[in-house]
């Protein structure tokens, strides 16, 4: 009986890993054993940073909103509080896009937030 080898599967597995290691430097690019560990590490970082990206964008939106709200005489936290009291349900991404691309519209929203805050203080 002929000895069964896994050569086709092994070759395709090695090829896949070496293809993923394209662009790596030195032995990490062409030697399977080092490529495999480098690719695994790269994939771990990739997974981790995909999760981090969500928080990074949220921080960016908050920074943009903070700057835009200070132009209208509000801090970021007072802007968000005023929007909640005014019943305006816009998320931070949409608000930051509005602050950049539609400053007049953002000014209207900020004014409504300010009025809601003043109404809460008086009443």
From Swiss-Prot:
Binds directly to 23S ribosomal RNA and is necessary for the in vitro assembly process of the 50S ribosomal subunit. It is not involved in the protein synthesizing functions of that subunit. This is Large ribosomal subunit protein bL20. GO terms for biological process: ribosomal large subunit assembly; translation. Belongs to the bacterial ribosomal protein bL20 family. Pfam families: Ribosomal_L20. The keyword Zinc-finger does not apply. The gene is rplT. Keywords: Ribonucleoprotein, Ribosomal protein, RNA-binding, rRNA-binding. It comes from the Bacteria. It comes from Chlamydia trachomatis serovar D (strain ATCC VR-885 / DSM 19411 / UW-3/Cx). One of its GO terms (cellular component) is cytosolic large ribosomal subunit. GO terms for molecular function: rRNA binding; structural constituent of ribosome. InterPro entries: Ribosomal_bL20 (IPR005813), RIBOSOMAL_L20_CS (IPR049946), Ribosomal_protein_bL20_C (IPR035566).
């Amino acid at each position: 009986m002929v000895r069964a080898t896994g050569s086709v599967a092994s070759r395709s597995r090695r090829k896949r890993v070496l293809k993923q290691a394209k662009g790596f430097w030195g032995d990490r690019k062409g030697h399977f054993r080092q490529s495999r560990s480098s690719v695994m590490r790269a994939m771990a970082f990739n997974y981790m940073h995909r999760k981090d990206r969500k928080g990074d964008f949220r921080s960016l939106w908050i920074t943009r909103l903070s700057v835009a709200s200070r132009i209208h005489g509000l801090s970021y936290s007072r802007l968000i509080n005023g929007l909640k009291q005014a019943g305006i349900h816009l998320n931070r991404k949409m608000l930051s896009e509005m602050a950049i691309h539609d400053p007049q519209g953002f000014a209207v929203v900020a004014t409504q937030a300010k009025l809601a805050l003043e109404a809460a203080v008086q009443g």
